[in-house]
């Protein structure tokens, strides 16, 4: 079985090297330390904007048009929002599953 896919990294699990602007004004090197160096309001605003804009339905359309058949989505351990101060992201993952189904893509997840 051949799989043609793409990794949707830095959407639900942040990678500083892929989007340093999210870490602006901090010395945090990863998502674990980011909320300790920002006010709760600033942290929440950055995360919500990032998640709503970084990967969208349009990306799933593009992935399908490029001939891909699958996407890999790294998923954080705080996906359900039960690990303060982190903000859950199950709603975004639900959207991804809906978009994948709509465009005939398979999803692989990576739990962290």
Q: Model-found features: residue ranges?
A:
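Substrate-binding cleft and catalytic face of glycoside hydrolase catalytic domains
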Residues: 57-112
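N-terminal carbohydrate-binding accessory modules
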Residues: 1-68
């Amino acid at each position: 079985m051949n799989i043609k896919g793409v990794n949707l990294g830095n959407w639900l699990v942040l990678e500083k090297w892929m989007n340093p602007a999210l870490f602006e004004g901090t010395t945090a090197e990863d998502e674990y330390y980011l909320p300790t160096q920002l006010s709760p309001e600033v942290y929440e605003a950055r995360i919500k904007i990032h998640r709503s804009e970084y990967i969208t339905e349009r990306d799933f359309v593009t992935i399908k048009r490029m001939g891909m058949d699958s996407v890999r989505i790294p998923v954080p351990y705080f996906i359900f929002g039960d690990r303060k101060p982190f903000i859950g992201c199950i709603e975004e993952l639900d959207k991804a599953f809906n978009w994948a189904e709509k465009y005939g893509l398979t999803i692989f997840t990576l739990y962290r």
